[in-house]
From Swiss-Prot:
Sequence segments annotated as region (Disordered): 299-493, 904-925
Protein name: Probable glycoprotein hormone G-protein coupled receptor
GO biological process: adenylate cyclase-activating G protein-coupled receptor signaling pathway; hormone-mediated signaling pathway
Biased amino acid composition, Polar residues: 301-318, 365-375, 400-410, 434-445, 476-493
Record region (5 X approximate tandem repeats): 333-461
Listed GO MF terms: G protein-coupled peptide receptor activity; protein-hormone receptor activity
Pfam families the UniProt entry points to: 7tm_1, LRR_5, LRR_8
Keyword vocabulary terms for this entry: Cell membrane, G-protein coupled receptor, Glycoprotein, Leucine-rich repeat, Membrane, Receptor, Repeat, Signal, Transducer, Transmembrane, Transmembrane helix
Topology class, membrane: Multi-pass membrane protein
Organism from which the protein derives: Anthopleura elegantissima
Start-end of each LRR repeat: 85-106, 110-131, 134-155, 156-180, 181-202, 203-224, 230-250, 251-273
UniProt record similarity statement: Belongs to the G-protein coupled receptor 1 family. FSH/LSH/TSH subfamily.
Amino acid sequence: MEDRGICPRVLQVLFLVVLILISPVYAAKNDACTKCSCNPKGMVSCFELQEFPPLATFPRNTTTLHVSFSGEISIPSDILQHLEKLKYLTLNNNKIKNIAKFRVKNGYSSLITLSYTHNIIETIENGAFDDLQQLTQLDLSNNRLKEFPIFNKTSSVTKLYLRGNPGITKLPRQSLGNLPSLENLFMERTGIQEIPAGIFRQNTRLINLYFNKTKALERINEDAFDEDSSLKTLVLDETSVTSLPSRGLKNLHFLSLKDVPNFWQLPELDSIREVYLSPYNGFLCCEFESGEKYGKDCTMQKPSTEENNGQTTASSPTKEPATSGLGGGTHLSTQPHTTSGFGGGGFPGGGGGFPGGGGFPAGGSKTSTQPHTTSGFGGGGFPGGGGGFPGGGGFPAGGSKTSTQPHTTSGFGGGGFPGGGGGFPGGGGFPGGSNTSTQPHTTSNSGGGGFPGGGGFPGGGTPFTNQFTIPHIPNVHQSTADPPTLIPHSNHTPNGTQFHQCSKIPVQCVPKSDAFHPCEDIMGYVWLTVVSFMVGAVALVANLVVALVLLTSQRRLNVTRFLMCNLAFADFILGLYIFILTSVSAVTRGDYHNYVQQWQNGAGCKILGFLAVFSSELSLFTLVMMTIERFYAIVHAMHMNARLSFRKTVRFMIGGWIFALVMAVVPLTGVSGYSKVAICLPFDVSDATSTAYVAFLLLVNGASFISVMYLYSRMLYVVVSGGDMEGAPKRNDSKVAKRMAILVFTDMLCWAPIAFFGLLAAFGQTLLTVTQSKILLVFFFPINSICNPFLYAFFTKAFKRELFTALSRIGFCKFRALKYNGTLSSFLYSRSRRHHSTVNAEHSTPKSKHASTMSLRQSHQDLYRKESKTAESLNGICNAGFNAHEETRTSPGSVRYVRSLRGVTKSSSPPHLKLQKQKILQSPS
């Protein structure tokens, strides 16, 4: 009987031993912690899973689940029913294709953060996140979503990441309306085309909005944001928007519009503090550089004072909450839009502690030097810290310290401040504290935990004075700064006297004005505008007169006159360039930065630049041809075959026109374009091709003027030395050579400085600013167009003859036309004959009077036929014609007129004319 009792007991013991031995093996085979890394504090990290472990095998205290690089796995929709304490679920870098609706237990879920980044998600079940009432952060970045996730119920999401989903093309009004707590919306690299009216009407807490690299975005409706919008950050880099709404941006602090090709005008932004633009529209910063426009920052608060050594000092103004921190005293840096917080109100409680070890949002993140970028890295390695999420300083930032750069925030929250404790060793922090880089508007989370143990500052906060120093904390920078200038405004309310304190903060706008984009008018100085306007007007009139006179002349067109016509045309175009440029400068004075797109980047500047380069090159080529023509005429006067024929001259000038046209067209192709500076000249030497073009242009011009100088030096030497020329030709050519030398040296005076400074600038040795260059290029450059018509036309007798002849045709300057045409002697002779005939007629019989009149007519007809042999004499006689019958009736007036002619022609007539006049006047009646 005893044996029978012993055997079963032995078997039972053996069974229990075997069960004890195999149970760990069985459990290990099915336990999630064998496939994943489990932390006693409730953190589970899984990598490269083939299938998702059974939910029942996860620790019941799991608060953080991190699954990545696990291929195409399926996440059970009831995961939150089994893991009731789960707060942070990150499923990044997998191959998940869809998201089913999450089921929760008793309508409640503890999930705070959900991340699905870098998957291949295409569809999300309708209302998939509706039951996640505690969800504050949802990240669906870098997937293949084709539409915005649908929210059928009001959600508590504050941060929504949808970047990297180009299939999302519309913003659904219903879904956004169910996100009233939304503060940050990240829509970078999506396919959104328009921000419609009233789309953010329910999102009154929206602070940060990112659409950068959304190239499809072309329009923001004027009513996209409500008047009471809280939007502070708007990033539109690399989009296609052309304007911003004038309403709903009154609280905007940060605006980025880099690489937005067609954006040319900023609306009124009362509270703006930072603006980032591209170099081609950086002129918009001129509105802020003047110092007349500031950002405003006003808060209403009750006055409070503190007694300190018998002195009453106003307390520091209460600012708006820190950008990435809740509560906590804030320290205002001298840089605009910066905030630094140190824990929550006196640094109680720990801070960030999730989740350590990197990942999303693991351990915090470190931001690169590029703006608006974030990269995750592992948590800190200090013992003890990190505990408790969100804990005192906790989420979203256990306190932050702002760097000296504008709009940057760095956190030093997390365990380690008093009460911090608990958590995983080296916990890091999500979002924990953040350490901001030196680049504007960047954030780096450096892990929450970090400083050992508790202790630290007492609760309650520390009052700030006008200038204060942060108490020494290990591994934390010290900072001393002054708050912005305060402008108090009293306002009486039923609760007591309150007042507004406004900080007047200068706006930081990037890029700053540079040498090629100064914040000034087109011409820079007022006096330069006035003088250049007069220069342009005179050049226009003078060269137009020269061209009209030469083209309407009845003389044969020879080589010299042909070259003069070309030079007058070129100088007229250059005068037109100066006249238009100064006119535009006068119209846009004081407000040019609002006209840059219309003028400098428009067709007007390109056309004007083309005219400037074309006219200058054509003028230079024509001067070279005129110099060569005079050189052969003077130095090789005896060699008739060596001179330029009219046909050769025309061919050369056709080549000159082609050269000038090519040089003017090149900048229109993008090589050293005309839009670099406001005066529309090819200043751009940013690449090798542009530098080569500018250098070639200046070298050709320099070589041309050196050649002209050499030829004229030879001509002057021959004229002065006499050579083999006869006296008369020598005297005539001497005058011509000296006149042409003055012309060329005047051109040299204008061109030499331009060539010198231009070549140095083309090769990187800039000695003048753009403003100084305007004086050189716009004031001295067109002097040629004024000098040339006077030097080669108005100061020569030949041109005076042409001018007065042309004027006589329309009834002006008839007598001077007779003088320069050489017909004045014939005119005086005929007048004298008529005078004597009239005197004799007074004493003769009617028959003799008739004979005298017939004789006078016959003499006049003979004289008319004689003078009509040449066109010039015919022109002079016709313009000075008279009626013999009328003269006989007005003999006293004729006598007086002849007497007046004596005095007029006494000193100006040649000797043979004087002798002829004396004979006529002394002849008997």
